[in-house]
Amino acid sequence: MSTAAVLVYPDFFKVAVSSAGNHDNAIYNRWWSEKHSGVKEIISEKGDTSFLYNIDKNPDLVKNLKGKLLLFHGEIDNNVHPANTMRVANALIKANKRFDMKILPTQRHGFGDMAEYVFWGMSDYFAKYLIGDNTERPVDLEEMNKEIEQSGNKKKQ
């Protein structure tokens, strides 16, 4: 949704970070699209029923990008296929649009033990492009994972 927002309303949204984004409903679960984006039932004069999905695809909207965009995706995402992000990246490149992208090796949809890395990556990106803070904050994933284990919270893998 963040990518769609920066592409549909480019004069309002200046920065977006997409985390395992569903950029093209044609290659995602139809039930999700129907539930969250709506579907229009059309009954012909003969009584035949068809359904209209009028959901814009982010790759078709990339020409509108004016702001900054960071795309994250897990290499083995088992919910939203990485092809969703690859399609929007391909369209952005063909439209000669600048963007940032990070593919997280061995990670699924929730980013597993790299979730903190993604969180701080998003934080740094927003700080840099919204308030001009270019301070890089190193993320010690091993230390963060130790702290999580010591606190008794279990991480999803």
List the model feature ranges, each with a label.
Residues 1-157:
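Active-site-proximal cap/loop segments of hydrolase catalytic domains
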